[in-house]
């Protein structure tokens, strides 16, 4: 009972702290100048993490302290960015969008809290607006909704083509961006605590390997998002797979399976409404059986290729929005994970040090004490102070010496 009373009291204190909350020095909008991000007139370096579960846990006021704990641990290490989902759709527990245009207010307030807490501590957010995958009601849920309304849809990739589904997505964009945060009283589209939106988490369109379908959708939706919210940066949420616009890269860098997903790193980001490039590095997912030396060699080629293309072809910053090494990888060791982090961070730092296009990296994923239901093979608890956490902290120290804006 004493524990419950303490949790309730903590939730009340946290909620009261947002009344009349003022912007911290790090709370300007992040913008872009060439291949660099800018915050308050200085280069802004992204050293961060993924925590897709923030809104889910914050839906219950009694568990919001877990978000506070994660952000406190992150800021103590100097981390500057968190990436979290802006979707949870369908007939699932704590859904955000329960049906097209219908939203659960309590879950929305969970997302409100995550944004408000990020603002309070000076962390910037990157928020994807839908999932390519079925998890948490991805594009499949939109297709199912359309089918239930009599639309003739045969594939989950009809998400990109069906006009009714496209309107569902646009309505979600409008609802999200026009939402007024119940804690900060600021509309999402006017909230500088958010750095950027992503159109989708890991967009793919396997029914059209030419890439034309996905390209048309990105073009249309990027312009639409910018018409609703011109304040924030926008990216695709891309994994970084190359397409027909760069056949040499496609042949030399792509995992073989990636040649069938209809994505094109160069073409999909070479749009005025897209402000920066996104990529992931899932070497443990794409190449399960690689030995460690081959894995590190791939990471080096993959990152350096994308950094070079962002610098010379796209002339935009690029963020590595997901990377890590899962404990379910064959022959996994903590030392191997540390090597993946060190290799990744070193490549990012070399580019950043020269004023290059590599703007930073976000590892997958952070969890907090008490959220073991979200724990996965790649999860990291920052308070554990593992050797990997020490590497994360050292990267922050090195990036900080470059003299830009590092967050609060």
Swiss-Prot record:
<dbReference type="Pfam" id="PF00150">
    <property type="entry name" value="Cellulase"/>
</dbReference>
<keyword id="KW-0732">Signal</keyword>
<feature type="binding site">
    <location>
        <position position="364"/>
    </location>
    <ligand>
        <name>substrate</name>
    </ligand>
</feature>
<feature type="binding site">
    <location>
        <position position="201"/>
    </location>
    <ligand>
        <name>substrate</name>
    </ligand>
</feature>
<comment type="similarity">
    <text>Belongs to the glycosyl hydrolase 5 (cellulase A) family.</text>
</comment>
<feature type="signal peptide">
    <location>
        <begin position="1"/>
        <end position="23"/>
    </location>
</feature>
<keyword id="KW-0964">Secreted</keyword>
<feature type="active site" description="Nucleophile">
    <location>
        <position position="322"/>
    </location>
</feature>
<feature type="active site" description="Proton donor">
    <location>
        <position position="202"/>
    </location>
</feature>
<dbReference type="InterPro" id="IPR001547">
    <property type="entry name" value="Glyco_hydro_5"/>
</dbReference>
<dbReference type="InterPro" id="IPR017853">
    <property type="entry name" value="Glycoside_hydrolase_SF"/>
</dbReference>
<keyword id="KW-0325">Glycoprotein</keyword>
<dbReference type="InterPro" id="IPR045053">
    <property type="entry name" value="MAN-like"/>
</dbReference>
<dbReference type="GO" id="GO:0016985">
    <property type="term" value="F:mannan endo-1,4-beta-mannosidase activity"/>
</dbReference>
<feature type="glycosylation site" description="N-linked (GlcNAc...) asparagine">
    <location>
        <position position="73"/>
    </location>
</feature>
<protein>
    <recommendedName>
        <fullName>Putative mannan endo-1,4-beta-mannosidase P</fullName>
        <ecNumber>3.2.1.78</ecNumber>
    </recommendedName>
</protein>
<dbReference type="GO" id="GO:0005576">
    <property type="term" value="C:extracellular region"/>
</dbReference>
<keyword id="KW-0378">Hydrolase</keyword>
<dbReference type="GO" id="GO:0000272">
    <property type="term" value="P:polysaccharide catabolic process"/>
</dbReference>
<keyword id="KW-0326">Glycosidase</keyword>
<feature type="binding site">
    <location>
        <position position="85"/>
    </location>
    <ligand>
        <name>substrate</name>
    </ligand>
</feature>
């Amino acid at each position: 009972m004493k524990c419950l009373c303490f949790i309730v009291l903590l939730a009340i204190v946290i909620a009261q702290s947002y009344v009349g909350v003022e912007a911290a020095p790090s709370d300007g909008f992040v913008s872009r100048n060439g291949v660099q991000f800018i915050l308050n007139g200085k280069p802004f370096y992204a050293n961060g993490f993924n925590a897709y579960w923030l809104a889910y846990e914050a839906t219950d006021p009694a568990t919001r302290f877990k978000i506070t704990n994660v952000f406190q641990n992150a800021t103590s290490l100097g981390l500057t960015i968190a990436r979290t989902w802006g979707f949870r759709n369908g007939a699932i527990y704590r859904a955000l969008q329960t049906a097209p245009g219908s939203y659960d207010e309590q879950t929305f307030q969970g997302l409100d809290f995550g944004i408000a807490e990020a603002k309070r501590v000076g962390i910037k957010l990157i928020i994807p607006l839908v999932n390519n995958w079925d998890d948490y009601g991805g594009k499949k849920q939109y297709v199912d909704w359309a089918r239930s309304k009599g639309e003739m849809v045969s594939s989950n990739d009809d998400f990109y083509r069906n006009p009714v589904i496209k309107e569902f997505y646009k309505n979600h964009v409008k609802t999200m961006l026009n939402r007024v945060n119940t804690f900060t009283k600021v509309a999402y589209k006017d909230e500088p605590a958010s750095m950027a939106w992503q159109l989708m988490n890991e967009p793919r369109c396997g029914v059209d390997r030419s890439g034309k379908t996905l390209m048309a959708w990105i073009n249309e939706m990027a312009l639409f998002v910018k018409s609703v919210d011109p304040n924030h940066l926008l990216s695709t949420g891309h994994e970084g797979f190359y397409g027909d616009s760069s056949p040499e890269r496609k042949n030399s860098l792509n995992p073989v399976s990636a040649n069938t997903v209809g994505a094109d790193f160069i073409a999909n980001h070479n749009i005025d409404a897209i402000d920066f490039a996104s990529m992931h590095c899932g070497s443990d997912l794409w190449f399960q059986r690689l030995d460690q030396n081959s894995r590190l060699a791939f990471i080096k080629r993959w990152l350096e290729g994308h950094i070079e293309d962002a610098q010379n072809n796209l002339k935009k910053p690029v963020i590595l929005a997901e990377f890590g090494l899962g404990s379910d990888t064959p022959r996994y060791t903590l030392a191997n994970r540390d090597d993946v982090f060190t290799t990744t961070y070193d490549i990012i730092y070399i580019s950043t040090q020269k004023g290059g296009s590599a703007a930073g990296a976000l590892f997958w994923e952070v969890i907090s004490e008490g959220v073991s239901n979200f724990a996965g093979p790649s999860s990291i608890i920052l308070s554990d102070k593992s050797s990997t956490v020490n590497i994360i902290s050292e990267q922050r120290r090195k990036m900080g010496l470059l003299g830009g804006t590092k967050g609060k």
